[in-house]
Amino acid sequence: MSGVVVVGAQWGDEGKGKLIDVFAEKADMVVRYQGGANAGHTLVVNGQKTVLHLVPSGILRPETTCVIASGVVIDVFSIRDEIKKLKDTGFLQNPKQLLISDTATLILPYHKALDAAREAALSDGKIGTTGKGIGPAYEDRASRRAILFGDLFDKDNLKKKLELALTEKNFMLENYYKGSTFKADDLIKDLLAVAEELAPYRTKDTSLFISKSLKSGKRVLFEGAQGTMLDILHGTYPFVTSSSTLASNACASAGIGPASVQKVIGVFKAYTTRVGSGPFPTELNDEIGKKIQADGHEFGSTTGRSRRCGWLDLVALKYAIRVNGITNLAMMKLDVLTGHDRIGVCTAYKLNGEIITDLPTSPYELEKVEPVIEWIPGWTQDLTKVKTLSDLPRPTTNYIDYLGSQLGTPIDVISVGPGREQTLWVKPLFNN
């Protein structure tokens, strides 16, 4: 079995979309296993930029089957528009290329309204939600009252479940947040219309389809969204997303056993970024941070928000390697660090006068740490035209070698630009 999980090893926005698109050349299938339209995966092919939020990043390769698994929360109006844009630009011409699980949870307009109302009510304690309704939709799934993708195709059941949901949601919106309410008839009309458009992609049991594909020798990539440090259980809670972003969730969401996974690839930037609130030990609130932000175009593809930037944090990265069981690493945006006299790498933290090398479990402790920085000589050469590893300047290879020795996990892929061709391979993705 050739299952490979691709997981974000930082706070998201590591470049997983580009990597999945590159990997998909050698894969038969890409499975998106968690999150929702809060993800923004940017792909650049032949100079054309495509931003995906729900559709798996393998969709730009016509021969690759893409699956949205049970653990994803789907805004049906958003995915309808995303599919239309793909079709209008020449992609997804065959509906059999995209399969959507019947048991995936729906994000409905009242989820987004609740998300926005709650964030506004938090005042100074904002989490930094994207306002896409992700959290409220996952809440409904956990409380066993979610409306699923398959419900769209059963009008009577959809009406019954929607009316029950609105009894609670409208009460909350009106009485707790003084907001507008929703009418069941209007929502049902809109949902039935979008159901017709999405019907060609409906798949009752994606778990069975994925399992059969793996057993027949197909190469399957599992695409995560966000990053390890945003995991609901093992991230910097409460400054996290509402799903498990770890590699282990690929199996649970897709409905396969862990023995199906051959390797776990952790994706990280050559520096660190974070969007929204929460601790960020290596954050640079100076001209260097602004330069990294500008050179890396560090603005969210989903929200447009600027990303906080800082030096690479090896304490957090080693934590991600441990909790995911990462076997191989991919370093993205190495080209962005061109032009710095020296490059900082955080190798430890100082907390209350003591040096620590393990990530604190409390975000409030993490907020107090001071990064212990080691300095590596920088380089001035433009890396975006580099075609082979041997063409990299010596200071750059020294940086790569230093990180590899510190992390104890091989760096197999290095990205030096947004395009497919700007990818350097140390070792092939699949073993066979």
Swiss-Prot record:
Enzyme type, top EC level: ligase
UniProt binding sites for substrate: S301, T302, T303, G304, R305, S306, R307
Localization per record: Cytoplasm
UniProt EC number: 6.3.4.4
UniProt keyword Repeat, yes or no: no
Alphabetical UniProt keywords: Cytoplasm, GTP-binding, Ligase, Magnesium, Metal-binding, Nucleotide-binding, Purine biosynthesis
Subunit: Homodimer.
The protein's name in its UniProt record: Adenylosuccinate synthetase
